From Swiss-Prot:
Name of the protein this chain belongs to: U13-hexatoxin-Mg1a
Organism: Macrothele gigas (Japanese funnel web spider)
Coiled coil: none
Keywords attached to this entry: Cleavage on pair of basic residues, Disulfide bond, Knottin, Secreted, Signal
Signal peptide: 1-17
Amino acid sequence: MKLSALVFVASVMLVAASPVKDVEEPVETHLAADLKTIEELAKYEEAAVQKRSCIVGSKNIGETCVASCQCCGATVRCIGEGTKGICNNYQTNNILGQILLYAKDTVVNTAGLLVCAQDLSEYE
């Protein structure tokens, strides 16, 4: 009886002392695969947003422009007159005012795409 109790205690100690890496590795591998998938989706989404916002315009914020349709972005406008314009957003410190400016610029840019070719032909 003492021998069976000793064997049982030794077995329990052996099981408790053995490493449990078999359970942790698949979880780490699964998390790494999920992270890689999320990073790929984020890159694809960023590229899709850039492609969608730059259908016509090819100039980024800070570059010179002639018409707003040259600027890349839904709310980015060509600020300035003639050939001295710069692609940028109109800014205000008021949050509600900024939302209204973004909405106005989006509508103006959308309507401006219809007459963009005519505006650019004047400066060529």
